[in-house]
Design a protein with these regions (language model features):
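Sequence signature of WD/YWTD-type beta-propeller architectures
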Residues: 1-168
Length: 168
């Protein structure tokens, strides 16, 4: 950062008085912040649009996955009536939602009993139109995963849970 001659001269004179120098420096920074701050608190070239229901809390899951499919047509996420500031409830499932971007259609396509607030159900796209998520087979008392195809609206059951998938 470059300082002008006046700023350097003042800084040199104040080296003998570190307490005063610190106070003046903070005041100078505050004045410059107020003088040059932007007139807005948030600026975006995009429109922000809510896609979940007002009465529910919605979330996707972990940061390493994208909720948007490769064709940018669909967004997947989990939705719940539970306050996500509290512990998940074992007997209460989360809804699995597919949002169709082209026609603004919000569709609950399933539910899952195996989730947490940080990673969700490990919901993730495995190709352009299919995603996978974890669930519980209550009759067999077994963790499973399910693959949902948004084009043919069909679910395939995999008899083990997943943590991650690759495109191979």
């Amino acid at each position: 950062m470059k300082y002008n001659k006046f700023e350097r001269k003042i800084a040199y004179l104040l080296t003998k008085f570190p307490g005063i120098k610190l106070a003046i420096k903070k005041m100078y920074q505050r004045v410059n912040y107020l003088r040059y701050k932007k007139s807005y608190t948030f600026k975006s070239d995009f429109t922000i649009k809510r896609i979940g229901k007002d009465s529910k809390e919605s979330y996707f899951g972990y940061y390493d996955k994208s909720p948007i499919n490769n064709t940018n047509e669909y967004i997947i996420f989990q939705s719940t009536n539970i306050d996500t500031k509290t512990m998940p409830e074992v007997k209460v499932p989360v809804d699995l939602v597919v949002y169709d971007v082209s026609n603004n259609n919000y569709e609950v396509v399933g539910q899952s009993y195996t989730y947490n607030w940080q990673q969700g159900t490990k919901l993730m796209w495995i190709d352009e139109y299919r995603f996978i998520y974890n669930d519980l087979d209550k009759s067999k008392r077994q963790y499973i995963s399910k693959i949902y195809d948004v084009k043919i609206k069909e679910i395939k059951i995999v008899h083990f849970p997943i943590y991650d998938c690759s495109g191979d």
